[in-house]
């Protein structure tokens, strides 16, 4: 039990104008709506009923209004609701007064319903409900129309409002758990009956709740209006003992009342990343549900519904678990398990580990960020996901009330009445048993549940673990046969040399640079493997990616083989756990010889060279036969089916079936047959060598893969004379044959983890069958058979086409038997005669010549080269619909009206040299465009306009540049805020015209980045506030953006520090990006940028460059359409980038909806880049992408070259506008009617590409407007900060460098306090110039981002508590947080500030008398801090500064930490096991200088906070010093603070 001490410019287009975005989309929820929110609950520990608790719940809900959002009318809330104990006092009196019926509470229930609006429909629905209740032996006591005040609704919510009724019933037979189940069964029967009858209003019928215990009031209202709308909630007779509340932020603005939360049991803040897989596995599982209470499954199923939200489906599955005898906490442990493997907190809780192990064998996790609050009336509680990606703070009061919410301070409580404060950590749970009146902590409730059944015994009896055996020690095939098979399966020499060999040597995926400038597989003239038609999806905004390297403790690639038929009872089925899905040939032999019956299906089909249709029919028929064979094997008891193409290809008349097609087809077929859960699929294939290939096979249903030909290739390569010579000469590591095979497999495993993690998925078992891809280039018949549920928007290959491409690949192996080397098709690197590359040498030379000679005729030659290229992008299949009404060229807007729409891509100074970076900035400023700083900060010297340029174009301020002019500006108009926050200071932010939040990058979405130490020169280190030579890691996610409401908070932060700038958000094109963009617009961004998959990069895994993201044409079209549909298009500017090179590209982008246009690679080429493609090596031969001084001196570019390119581009655009008959770009934005399919473009592979989604429009009604300005009524300022900055005494102190102290009240709705003040000071004095002192004392609970961007001269002292993001990007000053003096609890043990504090801080001090949440000091650059406890991942990615922790710490300390020093007090002797030692080392405090620094920081902590614990430490210093650990990254290992010998050497000198 928890210990509680008593005292201690666009075209407006109608919604109907667009066809469905996805032609193949049975799963609309997955792509068209996502949500986030603020949640919480309040409960009386003694289960006492009262109306005060209801009023408290409404107050708490109202204080989280900023976590929700509204529709485009800015008045209709996305949803708010409250689930609470049924106020039986009210309903008993109502029944007696109006129905003359005395309710028996133990047998009665109340259902809350949304009904259709028409009175006739209402009556029909009521009749059905009554009829079924009566058929099931219920007495219908009566209907009650719920009173409401519709005037509080916004226009859209009112338009879609249902009729709201309650029905009160009483069972004649049932009570208790039996009543619960029968209410569930009756509700499902009613829902199904209405669906079966297919009434036009069926979608408007909805049960909010139907229970003996709980009732739900919800709607499309703001949280501040819920009680005003539902007058019942203010009724004093509405006495309750608990309430769950929820405020929704949806990425869709069309009101849908049923999607408001809480659901019937859960209030969910998060996103299920594996939803499609979870739904399909649940569909497969339903046919084999086995439990005594489920003898009427047919009346209950289907349990899940693809048209429902992730929250609604999760709620339905939890509900099912409840009705087969499990509790809410148990169901959530089953479905959303914590990270139990290698968890030091659980090492003494073996039975709990056994529970998780047992469940993992039968139930995949519903994986993703989630804070879930829940109640079924028996318990109320909350559970957090395994990564802790949502905040959850709680407190207990003296009058025995428990409050938990997404924020602290949701109720204004007297501090003296609070007995306990805490938070949920990753994977943790808190539960109040209402019947037992028992509050249970995380381990209490979980150990109690784990002890209910003998899970350890069940595991011992029924589970085996496959112990991986050694690899083969010799080859199994002659070299010529290997060569033949490699050719048949589609290997090229690049696959061997760049991928397989690299992985075998290094044990990691190969890294490459720039983007993918080759044709899409479906457009290519070369044969491709089927995997190339699949693009990986990734997380952006609505959920974060994970760092699979530094946070591996939450990830697992283990999975299970065998039958998984029953999730509800003890099962005698044997299962086999495998620790990796990558199997060697020996592993496969062990599996075949295991207790699990295993059979093999050979996956080949008969080839007919003379008839594509016959080939297609042969392929289709063979797959159908395999499916039927598999079903027969399952019915005969087979538990594992191996799909194998390991056969000898003796003739051309036989071809393998692409393994992805086989596994996908079987997976889908077996689900539909209801037997999928009875068998595991293993793929034994020669066509699998890249991490992307493995991900596809697993994502479509395979449990494991044996890549026999890839392993054989590794063996032959190792045994080759060339490899042996290289090893003997020391030119490559001296590795054994076993080691290279192991390296290859480990690199695949690491690559898989990265693919999972960039979608925010932690567990391979959740990824298997989850289909987290988008298809580019497969037709409906192929998708429906093998990949149902995966979106394929442009159609593509039929079975005949696919069969022919496969046969072409396979037959090539027979025609090239005498060759000594595989073909090199140039899929990665350009080569003459190979695959076409847009960035080819001929193009680069043509552009260089044109811009250097300033010759438009030469530019036209460059343009013609690109116009005559083979089809490469989707836009190549489109053409302009020229009309006869052209306009004279002189009437078209001038060049500089067009160039002001141009931007360069976000390329960092660090990835680029100073010369290249500054040249681009000057050029863009000259033409009125906007350059983008990229990540990494910017030299403040660049913020001043040049005035010292001589007649030769040189400036002493920038002696390394040429071709300068007086009046030039080197300041990037767009300054980027990326996940590393390098160089983000107040001064940097206030010198921007736009601030760009980079969520994703086209070439590596969801992956973050890394600047190698060799590129961190002294100059780069100065800008990024770190030491030279230190590797700098940018995390995959922004650690202050785990959800859409988090993004809204960051946008709000930026608007505070720089109120004059617009905020842009950079996204990468993928299915569903339109949904995300709607959320981004609602979050307050004025600009949304959509990047294509072919964008450039300084360094990225090769598989990401080739296989992640989709073309910008699809993303831009989707975003524009959905913004129009949601009435938000006028509020944002749309920008697009990714492979734009010509005016034709720009005009096509405009027609698809873009207002502005970004250029990266082509701008660099104009500036001198020769596409050497060695950016990742720091060896660029022309000084563009290097920090080596001698190479930078070779940089050939001058600003005029870049200016010339953009002038030529604008002139080309003017000519096209003239031909189209328009005078401005604004007039054609979104004009899909000006696009046609280009029938002149002939494709090699198929005639089935469908581009109609881009130009099929049902009406031509347009209303032309100028470029939107991003204006909104949405509040963009902190009222408290506004009042502070408009206070005359503060303004006087700022202007005159005076000292001033003020005292101010604060609440959780006061967000970003201090940011506006910091921005004002930075604008006036830069980061360091203010010489006065502002001391602001706040009292209460601070909202998010307290002290963000704090600056020198400002002290923020908070007496109370703070929420997340304290001190974000602070550059100076002090932040002090202490509890009120009247608190009764031990302050050092309590949570006083939230998650992700000191994120990206570059200076200043933070002192906190209490503990922080997760990720304290993440990416801290140079701030100093002392506090008394931290959660998981403290000091992650830290590059400088000092952190002192005087209390308990979570796991994974110092992951990715490359600089700075941290000190941890280890009172429990368990800290070493919590430190991530991949980079840092841990030692005691060994030097006098370190002791001195540590004691000085603790003394200052005492001075600032009065900490009793710190006082005790100082009093007993000689004892406590021996309990401190010092964490030391390599960059600090040779300093006098960390190295005794260095210290003595310094002293000696």
Curated annotation (Swiss-Prot):
One of its GO terms (biological process) is ammonia assimilation cycle. CDD domains: gltB_C (cd00982), GltS (cd00713), GltS_FMN (cd02808). Gene3D superfamilies: Aldolase class I, Glutamate synthase, alpha subunit, C-terminal domain, Glutamine Phosphoribosylpyrophosphate, subunit 1, domain 1. It comes from Cyanidium caldarium (Red alga). Belongs to the glutamate synthase family. Its EC number is 1.4.7.1. Monomer. This is Ferredoxin-dependent glutamate synthase. The active site is at 37 (for gatase activity). GO terms for molecular function: 3 iron, 4 sulfur cluster binding; glutamate synthase (ferredoxin) activity; metal ion binding. Binds 1 [3Fe-4S] cluster. GO terms for cellular component: chloroplast stroma. FMN binds at residues 1116-1173. InterPro entries: Aldolase_TIM, ET-N_metabolism_enzyme, GATase_2_dom, Glu_synth_asu_C, Glu_synth_asu_C_sf, Glu_synth_centr_N, Glu_synthdom, Ntn_hydrolases_N. It is an enzyme of class 1 (oxidoreductase). Residues 37-435 form the Glutamine amidotransferase type-2 domain. Keywords: 3Fe-4S, Amino-acid biosynthesis, Chloroplast, FAD, Flavoprotein, FMN, Glutamate biosynthesis, Glutamine amidotransferase, Iron, Iron-sulfur, Metal-binding, Oxidoreductase, Plastid. Disulfide bonds: none annotated. The lineage of its organism: Eukaryota, Rhodophyta, Bangiophyceae, Cyanidiales, Cyanidiaceae. Pathway: Amino-acid biosynthesis; L-glutamate biosynthesis via GLT pathway; L-glutamate from 2-oxoglutarate and L-glutamine (ferredoxin route): step 1/1; Energy metabolism; nitrogen metabolism.
